[in-house]
Amino acid sequence: MTNDFKPAKAGGNQPRLSKEEYAEKKRAEKEKVYQMIDDAAREIVSDPEKFKNFLDTQSRMDRYSAANALLIYSQYPQATQLKDFDDWGKDNVKITKGAKSISILEPVEYTRADGSPGISYNVKKVFDVTQTNGRKAPAVSANRDPKALITSMLDVSPVEVAATDELPYPNMAAFYNNEKQTLYVKRNVGDSVAVAQCVAQELGHAQLSINSESYSRRDMGFQAVCIGYMICKKYGVDTQNFAINRIPEGLASKEPKEIRAELSKTRNAMAEIHSHISDEMFRKKQERSKDYER
């Protein structure tokens, strides 16, 4: 048995690392990744266009944490499907020669000295499908089906849904009332894209209220806009009307750790809404298939 550790990609002529040297190498690697997260957090809140680009990345990579989305945005923002070298190999997919790996954080469970469970994070090297000879999924069509999205969003709403002729803001097609725990949708709005945008944003308010100990529509307004933007982006609905052209001073002035916490709340609410919508759309698709078979 040896106490020597060899780097994953060590060449035949490279010296082995001692246990201490290997640990130091991994510590430095992790430190570099955390610095990359902090730098990306500062960068996106300094420029609305960069913030929007980050939201585009997070909307595609909805299963990844905000911290990992920041890492992906910083290294390979156009990513759509990530796997490590071994997992691509299991699918008989080869990495393109010269492709640069993307560093993300992978949670690892461990047992503390007192016997309680804990979670630490290791740096994991992954590659996007575009860095391989694998097939890339087709891009989402613009305005794919806003009416279907509206129906699914209302069907899976975590709060009551009610139709109304008037809303507090005339230019809105939907409004979440936290006191009544109800999502109101305006009748006879002909523009299905506008309705989809409003419903997605107001669902963001509803989900943020559910996920938070306290709720303020004013304080959470920008987060709800971001959620609506990401949901519409994910389902191919136009996003130009979402007001992400100005970063709130309260967010821009925060420290990187605080920015990441806000992004995490936004990402978690978006991912929860998307999960319910996706499940509902799949269920309806299955029903249509059964009807067709009959």
Report residues per predicted region.
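N-terminal accessory/interface modules of nucleic-acid-binding and processing proteins
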Residues: 1-294
